[in-house]
Regions:
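Short, compact, well-ordered microdomains
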Residues: 40-72
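An N-terminal amphipathic alpha-helical segment
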Residues: 1-25
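Catalytic residues for metal-mediated phosphoryl-transfer on nucleic acids/nucleotides
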Residues: 26-30
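Residues that form generic nucleotide/phosphate-binding pockets
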Residues: 13-14, 36, 45
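Short, surface-exposed ligand-recognition loops at beta-strand->loop->(often short) alpha-helix junctions
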Residues: 31-37
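Alpha-helical protein-protein interaction elements
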Residues: 2-3, 7, 34, 43, ...
Length: 73
């Protein structure tokens, strides 16, 4: 992402992506989330949508569906 964007624009771009629309997985840099919308607002929106999210190595991994997550290893 380039330049400052509003929280509404951030979420619009995130949830209008092909992966998000098809119920797949998307990633966002933690620093971008914190810069554009704030961690708390981001997590509240994902919780509202029922989308699981995990954090690893400076990335948020968002499962754009409400299916259970099973760690296999």
């Amino acid at each position: 992402m380039t330049g400052p964007i509003s929280p509404d624009e951030f979420f619009s771009r995130l949830f209008s992506s092909k992966a998000a629309r098809s119920g797949a997985v998307v990633r966002r840099q933690v620093r971008d989330v914190e810069r554009y919308v704030g961690r708390e607002h981001f997590l509240l929106e994902l919780r509202r949508r029922g989308f699981p999210v995990i954090e690893n190595a400076g990335q948020f991994i968002i499962f754009c569906n409400q299916e259970p997550i099973e760690r296999v290893i």
